[in-house]
């Protein structure tokens, strides 16, 4: 099945591909889209296979490497030789895998609350989420989602927005089998021993109050990668690109401006 993707901005702009986390939706990046376009970038966003407008039944053995191949398919379809890949959580894992498998296609990486190997805390969180899905079904699963994504104070302050997001997530839930396959893929991901082989300049961004992925996972990425800019926020939660969008966008644009080669479109 073909993947749904969107291309925004000038044809000659530096290409930035946005890869979402577990939810898989291109819409996750709405807080970044305007800033990237204003900076002159050509922006590619997509719904990951088995989510949103890219419907598919995922096999139990579906892996991050399969998701990286999907990105190659999108780059080929959009005549994009290489891109700056911005990935949130699972999307960051896709970027790391792509940088290992197809290094010529990756101009730079931006890894937002990502990781290089499993950790016990995140495993416990995903165990709880799967148990909720198994025992109570999709509605309970999506009702709990904001607890893992956002700080409590932000959820309280933006209660209606959170409620609307939950309703939308339930209406577009990809199915229990697909969700289990996607969680299985991110839980199996472990390229920690290969971090040193990644040469693409990388921005590692994390919020230190992330309740799902410890900030130490981002520190580990920074320690293992060769060419790293590290940006920690004291707060913002797992989706700090949403809750602290202005701060995140400044860091993102500064990094992209620094690593973009003048006159050489990505």
From Swiss-Prot:
Instruction: Report the enzyme's class at the first EC level.
Output: hydrolase
Against SUPFAM superfamilies, the record matches this protein to: alpha/beta-Hydrolases
Q: Extract the PANTHER family matched here.
A: MONOACYLGLYCEROL LIPASE (PTHR43798), MONOACYLGLYCEROL LIPASE ABHD6 (PTHR43798:SF5)
A GO CC annotation given for this chain:
membrane
Swiss-Prot/TrEMBL catalytic activity: carbamate + 2 H(+) = NH4(+) + CO2
Record-level GO BP terms: acylglycerol catabolic process; nitrogen utilization; uracil catabolic process
For this entry, the protein name equals Putative carbamate hydrolase RutD
Name the domain of life this protein comes from: Bacteria
Residue ranges of every copy of the AB hydrolase-1 domain listed in the record: 15-128
Q: What does this protein do?
A: Involved in pyrimidine catabolism. May facilitate the hydrolysis of carbamate, a reaction that can also occur spontaneously.
The entry sums up its family as follows: Belongs to the AB hydrolase superfamily. Hydrolase RutD family.
Q: Which GO terms describe its molecular function?
A: hydrolase activity, acting on carbon-nitrogen (but not peptide) bonds, in linear amides; monoacylglycerol lipase activity
Q: Tell me the keywords, alphabetical order.
A: Hydrolase
Q: Name one Pfam family in it.
A: Abhydrolase_1
**Which Enzyme Commission number(s) are on file for it?**
3.5.1.-
